[in-house]
Design a protein with these regions (language model features):
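A short acidic, helix-capping loop that chelates divalent metal ions and anchors anionic groups
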Residues: 39-44, 77-82, 117-122, 192, ...
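Active-site acidic/histidine proton-transfer and metal-coordination neighborhood
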Residues: 60-67, 79-181, 191, 271, ...
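Active-site beta-loop-alpha junctions enriched in small/polar residues
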Residues: 6-10, 34-38, 73-76, 114-116, ...
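Glycine-rich, proline-tolerant flexible connector loops at the mouths of alpha/beta enzymes
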Residues: 32-57, 119
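Histidine-acidic metal/acid-base catalytic patches
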Residues: 1-4, 12-29, 62, 137, ...
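Accessory recognition modules or surfaces
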Residues: 9, 43-45, 49-53, 259-269
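Short glycine-enriched, charge-decorated loop/helix-capping segments at active-site entrances
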Residues: 43-48, 84-87, 125-127, 223-228
């Protein structure tokens, strides 16, 4: 199993050859390309400019032996999904992210559920479900046209009725599109009271398109390194092996979540993190 990490963990910008080289030297051959920030220039690109930008990044990554296997679609904090106009604007940016995902050669664009009532309340669960059902039915059709899949992500928001892996799985099955699968976030599982391995098994190989791997103590989405929180990593690896997961083990943590690290200490810690990822991935393959 390959291991991966987000572009921002190593790269200062899209042209950072030294960052690519260091990433590859530390054992990573897979990458998540982050498009969460809706102010990124790519969202203002004309189609030809977007193609040039994404193809240039893909070629640079591949020249270093790294493939972009997944991306992260647009996201605003706090959520801005309350009105039809806001959801339409978000939909358009997500379509851009799906096209960019295809141009990068990735197969999955990770996207969060729509949160029309915010992230800490759910006064109308049926309305929340209907909005998301309509939204992702349309968006998954666009994903199919692009030749990619949405990885609908479980959320660390216990108040929402569309946050837990089982709820995400139910929506994905109801829509039933080849363009809609699941990204399982291990840290988010813990915040909603579930061990990641217990979430992996019901999803299964066919619908588990991507991973976000990190840890916490169950009280908040802290993006800590694996083995520093409450996740049962042996069981998580076992579950991945049981379902035959074939994607990369993608970290969603880095030195940024470790604290302010002196420059001369950074690389040994980066290597340590990559070895942790390698341990989890190897355990999944051997189990």
């Amino acid at each position: 199993m390959r291991i991966g990490i987000g572009n921002t963990a190593y790269l200062r910008d899209d042209n950072d050859d030294a960052g690519f080289a260091r990433m590859r030297a530390h054992g990573y051959t897979s990458m998540n390309y982050d498009m969460a920030d809706t102010a990124l220039p790519l969202y203002g690109d004309a189609p030809a400019a977007l193609e040039r930008r994404m193809r240039a990044f893909r070629e640079r990554a591949e020249s270093h032996g790294i493939t972009v296997d997944q991306t992260h679609g647009p996201w605003r904090w706090p959520p801005q999904d309350a009105t039809e106009e806001q959801r339409t604007e978000r939909f358009e940016k997500m379509c851009t992210a799906l096209r960019a995902t295809a141009l990068l050669g990735a197969k999955c664009c990770v996207i969060h559920p729509v949160m029309p009532f915010g992230c800490d309340k759910d006064p109308a669960p049926e309305r929340l479900w209907a909005i998301n059902g309509a939204f992702f039915s349309r968006l998954s059709a666009e994903a199919e046209r692009c030749g990619v899949a949405i990885g609908l992500e479980n959320m660390p928001m216990p108040a929402l009725s569309l946050a837990r892996p089982a709820e995400i799985l139910r929506l994905v099955r109801e829509i039933g599109s080849a363009g809609l699968k699941i990204c399982l976030d291990t840290g988010h599982c813990l915040v909603t009271g579930q061990q990641p391995g217990d979430a992996v098994r019901p999803i299964g190989r066919d619908l588990l398109a991507a991973l976000h791997v990190h840890d916490n103590d169950g009280t908040g989405d802290f993006h800590r390194w694996p083995f520093t929180g409450k996740a049962d990593w042996a069981d998580f690896s076992a579950a991945l092996g049981e379902i035959g997961f074939s994607g990369p083990l993608m970290l969603e943590t880095s030195l940024r979540f470790f604290g302010h690290v002196p420059a001369d200490c950074a690389e040994p810690l980066q290597i340590a993190l990559s070895r942790i990822a390698r341990h989890i991935a190897d355990a999944a393959e051997s189990g």
